[in-house]
Regions:
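Membrane-proximal helix-turn-helix segments that form the acceptor-binding/catalytic region
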Residues: 30-32, 134-154, 162, 167
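Acceptor-binding helix/loop patch of EC 2.4 sugar-transfer enzymes
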Residues: 12-16, 68, 119-146
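Conserved nucleotide-sugar phosphate-binding/catalytic loop shared by glycosyltransferases and other
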Residues: 51-76
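An amphipathic, basic-hydrophobic alpha-helix
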Residues: 67-99, 104-108, 112, 137-145
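Carbohydrate-associated surface elements
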Residues: 159, 179, 191
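Active-site proximal beta-strand in glycosyltransferases
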Residues: 3-6, 96-98, 111-129, 153-154
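N-terminal subdomain of nucleotide-sugar transferases
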Residues: 1-51, 92
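Conserved donor-binding/catalytic core segment of Leloir-type glycosyltransferases
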Residues: 4-6, 154, 188-216, 227-228
Length: 230
C-alpha cells in the first residue's frame, strides 16, 4: 500500500522565522510514518523545506521537502503554502493520502484534486487566531463547506469532531488521536502514584493552570501524588 502523509509543519515555532533543528526523528509525524512502514506500507512524507534539519539524516522512508512559497503572505509556522503538493499527490499513484487540518491551503489542493483517497486529520477544535480569527471564520464558513465535500475528515478528539462537524458533513464517527511510539514509551501494568504532562514552557500553553489543578487534586484527594512536567 502506497501512503502519502502531507504534514508541512513538523514542529512548533512561535513566529515565521523557522528555527533549525538537528533532527526530525523526535517528531510525532515521523513516528506515524514509521508505524505505517512497520505495517508494510510504502510511505512518503511531504513536508515544508523550511523544516529540513540542519544535519544530514538517513530515513527508512521517502521524504519530499516541498518548496514553501509566498511566506510573507502565508506565515510558514501556521499556514505554509506548498503548491507542488498537488503534483506529488497526482503523480505518485498513492492508495491513501493523509493531510493535516481542514484550515490548510495544501489540504484544500488535495481535497480538490484527489478527494477519493484522501483523509483530512483534523486537530483544531476552535477557530485559529490568524488575522484575528477572521481568516478562520471565512475558511470554515465558506471554503470548508464547498471545497471539502468529498474528502473524509477524521478528528483527533471529541472537541475537534464537534467543531468541524459544524462546517463539514463528511466527518467520521471514529476519532483517531495522536499515537504513541511504544518503543520509546513502554506500556506496563504497574502504576506509580504520579501524573505526567508533556508541554512547551511558553506563556500561551498556560502550564500554570495544570499546576493549579494538580494542587487542588492534592488538597482534595491525595497529597502524596507527584507531578512531572516534561
Amino acid at each position: 500500500m502506497k501512503v502519502l502523509i502531507v504534514n508541512p509543519i513538523l514542529y512548533t515555532n512561535e513566529n515565521r522565522n523557522i528555527k533549525k533543528v538537528n533532527t526530525i526523528k523526535d517528531t510525532m509525524i515521523y513516528d506515524l510514518c514509521l508505524a505505517f512502514k512497520k505495517k508494510g506500507c510504502d510511505v512518503t512524507l511531504a513536508a515544508s523545506d523550511l523544516y529540513k534539519p540542519s544535519e544530514n539524516e538517513s530515513y527508512p522512508l521517502n521524504i519530499i521537502w516541498m518548496r514553501t512559497r509566498l511566506t510573507k503572505l502565508f506565515p510558514p509556522h501556521t499556514l505554509p503554502y506548498c503548491p507542488e503538493v498537488k503534483k506529488i499527490a497526482k503523480s505518485g499513484n498513492f492508495d491513501l493520502i493523509i493531510t493535516s487540518e481542514v484550515f490548510s491551503l495544501n489540504s484544500l489542493k488535495l481535497a480538490l484534486c484527489t478527494p477519493k483517497n484522501l483523509i483530512v486529520w483534523q486537530e483544531l477544535g476552535k477557530h485559529n487566531r490568524i488575522f484575528h480569527g477572521l481568516a478562520s471564520k471565512f475558511w470554515y464558513g465558506i471554503v470548508a463547506k464547498t471545497g471539502f465535500k468529498k474528502a473524509l475528515i477524521v478528528a483527533r478528539s471529541v472537541q475537534s469532531r464537534e467543531f468541524i462537524s459544524k462546517y463539514c458533513k463528511n466527518v467520521s464517527d471514529t476519532i483517531i488521536d495522536h499515537g504513541v511510539n511504544i518503543e520509546k514509551f513502554t506500556p506496563c501494568r504497574e502504576k506509580d502514584n504520579q501524573f505526567a504532562i508533556s508541554s512547551q514552557l511558553i506563556s500561551r500553553k498556560h502550564i500554570e493552570k495544570s499546576i493549579e489543578a494538580f494542587a487542588k487534586y492534592l488538597n482534595k484527594y491525595d497529597d502524596s501524588a507527584k507531578l512531572y512536567i516534561m
